[in-house]
Curated annotation (Swiss-Prot):
InterPro entries: DedA-like, VTT_dom. Keywords: Cell inner membrane, Cell membrane, Membrane, Transmembrane, Transmembrane helix. This is Inner membrane protein YabI. Its main location: membrane. It is a multi-pass membrane protein. It is found in: Cell inner membrane. The chain crosses the membrane at residues 8-28, 29-49, 59-79, 145-165, 179-199, 216-236. Residues 1-7, 50-58, 166-178, 237-254 are periplasmic. GO terms for biological process: FtsZ-dependent cytokinesis; response to ionizing radiation.
Length: 254
């Protein structure tokens, strides 16, 4: 899939933007997004943006269009086929996730639609479930548009950072900088994830809860987060940081 996307992009800008629309659309489409490695594909497209092969602003607009198309078709499918969907064996097997999504939409519909756009398992479900619950369009449209405006750059970002790092001129410190950038990103991401696990420690009932008990999270979370912050400070003070920032500015056209 990644090789196919790269082939399209080298052939035409139009093909590249069509690829962005397609990935964003399928990632947002009801249930399809559960099996599509959309996060990886969006990061791959982000790497092409970071390397200058694809316009950031054009890709952002294409991502918004694909996202809105997928969400609104999902909403319509949920509204139109709500009864058959409730009887579908696939949804019966994932009834717990469906029930949680329905409960969240009943309690905090706008917040759930907005935040659900950024959470992998719920992203392709929330619009469909909102349609199944006959949620008024007026309640769906505002958080959905906001989410679709913010989602593409958020998912492009890891790839953009990696693609821009590739363009750093080769030198004695370029390898060191790239490894430091990777380590910083990993520690900050893991630290953020652990913060989320700690916040949900009283509610989480998955397999990881056995290994990441609240007591363990209370010391592991600040440790990993502190390492990430220290790595970020070292990264910011690295001699190649101005070069990297200049590349990123060119990518976004600032």
């Amino acid at each position: 899939m990644q090789a196919l996307l790269e082939h399209f992009i080298t052939q035409s800008t139009v093909y590249s933007l069509m690829a962005v629309v397609l990935v964003a659309f399928l990632e947002s489409l009801a249930l399809v997004g559960l099996i599509l490695p959309g996060t990886v594909l969006m990061a791959g497209l982000g790497a092409l943006i970071g390397s200058g092969e694809l316009s950031f602003w054009h890709a952002w607009l294409a991502g918004i269009i694909g996202c809105l198309m997928g969400d609104w078709i999902s909403f319509w499918l949920g509204w139109r086929f709500k009864k058959p969907l409730h009887r579908w064996s696939f949804l019966k097997k994932n009834k717990a996730l469906l029930d949680k999504t329905e409960h969240a939409l009943h309690q905090h519909s706008m917040f759930t639609i907005l935040v659900g756009r950024f959470v992998g398992p719920t992203r392709p479900l929330v619009p469909m479930v909102a349609g199944m619950l006959d949620l008024p369009v007026a309640k769906f449209i505002t958080p959905n548009i906001i989410g679709c405006l913010l989602w593409p750059p958020f998912y492009f970002l890891p790839g953009i950072l990696a693609g821009a790092a590739i363009d750093i001129p080769a030198g004695m410190q370029s390898g060191e900088f790239k490894w430091l950038l990777l380590a910083t990103a990993v520690f900050l991401w893991v630290g953020g994830w652990l913060c989320w696990r700690l916040w949900r420690s009283g509610k989480a009932t998955d397999r990881l809860s056995h290994y990441l008990s609240r007591g363990r999270l209370l010391w592991l979370t600040p440790l990993i987060s502190a390492i990430g912050v220290v790595a970020l400070v070292v990264l910011i003070r690295h001699p190649l940081m101005p070069v990297y920032i200049d590349i990123l500015r060119k990518v976004v056209g600032v």
